[in-house]
Amino acid sequence: MITTREDLVRYAKGMELLGEIVSWNCSNISISQTALEEALKAADLSTHVTPELPFQTAFNRACKNLGQKHLIRKLEEDSEFLYFQFTREAREGEYFTYETEGKLTLSKETGKIACTVPELGQAVQEELDKELPLRKGADVSKLLLKLLEHEAGLFPVRPQGGCYLVMKEHSAFLDSLESFTGRVGGCLLRYPIPSGTRSGDQSVKLTIASALSALINEYSNSIDNFGSDTKPSTLEKAADHIRVARFKVESYSAYLEDERSKLDDLLVAASERLKEKVSAIAAGV
C-alpha cells in the first residue's frame, strides 16, 4: 500500500510507462533565427525544419508594432506583390472617424515595401526589418509540432490541439526536445502515463485510435474528390498515404487492442474506394 511520499517515489521509479502527455509554453519567446538553430544543434535536433519567416507574417507583426491607430486591410495580391490599404482611425467627440492614409505594396520575393506615403512606408519597413530575423512563440510552437510529427508520431489528446500523447519509445527524443525548449526560453511539460491502470490504458488506446481514424478518414475524403482531371501522381500519393496509415496501425497494434479491427475496416474501405476511382478514371467515367 502507498501511504507516504517515499512509497510513491519508490513505486514511480519501478513502474513501466506507456508514454507521456506533452504540452509546452512558448508565450514569451523572442529569439533570432541564428540562436534558434544553435539551440537545435545543442540539443542534437535537426536544423532542417526551420524555414524562413514568410514576409507576410513578419509584415503582420510589424504592423501590430505600429499600434492600434492604423487599420490595415489587404486589397489584393498577384504573383509578385501584396497590396494593402492603411486607414487612420481617430475618436472625435461621440464618433470614430476614418481617413485613408495610403496604399502599401509588399514584395513577396524581397520583403521590400513601397508606399504612396513615404514616411508611412519607411516606418513599416523599419519594423519589418526588425521582425524578419526574430522567431516568436508561435514560430517555436510550429517547430515543436513539426519535430514531433517527424520524429515521434504524436497523437492529439484533445481536438483543439495543444496537448499530445507521445509513446515511451520516444522518451530520449523528448529529452532533447525539453533541452531545446528550455534553451530558447520556453518550457516543455511532460506528464508520464504509467502502464497497468485501467483508465490510463483505455485513454491511450482511444487517443491513438481516434487520431488514426481521423487520418484514414481524411485520406478517404480526399479520394472522394478525385475525378477525370486527377493526375496519376495524385493517385500514387493517395496509395502511399494508405500504405503509411496501414503501417501506423500495425506499429501501434499493441496499444489498440479491439480498436485495431475497426481501423483495418476503414483501411480496406479506403483501398477499395481508391481502386474504384482509378478504374472509373481509366474508363473515362
Annotate each predicted stretch with a short phrase:
Residues L104-A123, D201, K205, D224-N225:
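Basic, amphipathic alpha-helix used for nucleic-acid engagement in HTH/winged-helix/SANT-Myb modules
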Residues L120, S213-V285:
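C-terminal accessory extensions appended to soluble enzyme cores
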Residues G121-K136:
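Extended, non-catalytic structural segments that build the interaction scaffolds
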Residues M1-I2, V22, L145, E250-S253, ...:
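Replication-associated primase and helicase/ATPase modules
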Residues S30-T50, T57-K64, L134-A138, K142, ...:
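Terminal interaction module
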Residues I2-Y11, L18-H70, T110-V124:
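Active-site helix-to-loop segments that bind/position phosphate- or nucleotide-bearing substrates
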Residues P51-C115:
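Low-complexity, serine/threonine/proline-enriched polar segments
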Residues G14-E16, P156-V157:
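Short, flexible turn/loop "capping" segments at secondary-structure junctions
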